[in-house]
Amino acid sequence: MAKQSMKARDVKRVKLAEKFYAKRAELKQIISDVNASDEDRWNAVLKLQTLPRDSSPSRQRNRCRQTGRPHGVLRKFGLSRIKVREAAMRGEIPGLKKASW
């Protein structure tokens, strides 16, 4: 089990990313615009740097919903590989069965 503080930190990062999404996209648009003046682009870079670090989507981590495990998380289920296997063996995931060939 992950510490509660680690889970809370990831929740905070998700909220910050949603809050600053529009502003971040607007600044990135200015930075990538070749027709914008160098001064405008430089100011956009400086403004982007002043935004909170945790508002960047790349700082988010997919975690297991049950355990908070950060590695081996299957996006389709939102669970770690271990919990997916346990749930599949109990028959709790419809349509999922053990491979056999």
UniProtKB/Swiss-Prot annotation:
Keyword line: Ribonucleoprotein, Ribosomal protein, RNA-binding, rRNA-binding
UniProt keyword annotation of RNA-binding present: yes
Molecular function terms from GO: rRNA binding; structural constituent of ribosome
Coiled-coil stretches noted in the UniProt entry, renumbered to this chain: none
Transmembrane domains' residue ranges: none
GO CC annotations on file: cytoplasm; small ribosomal subunit
Alphabetized SUPFAM superfamilies for the sequence: Glucocorticoid receptor-like (DNA-binding domain)
Pfam families noted in UniProt: Ribosomal_S14 (PF00253)
Example GO biological process: translation
Subunit structure, as described in the record: Part of the 30S ribosomal subunit. Contacts proteins S3 and S10.
Family: Belongs to the universal ribosomal protein uS14 family.
Its job: Binds 16S rRNA, required for the assembly of 30S particles and may also be responsible for determining the conformation of the 16S rRNA at the A site.
Descriptive protein name: Small ribosomal subunit protein uS14
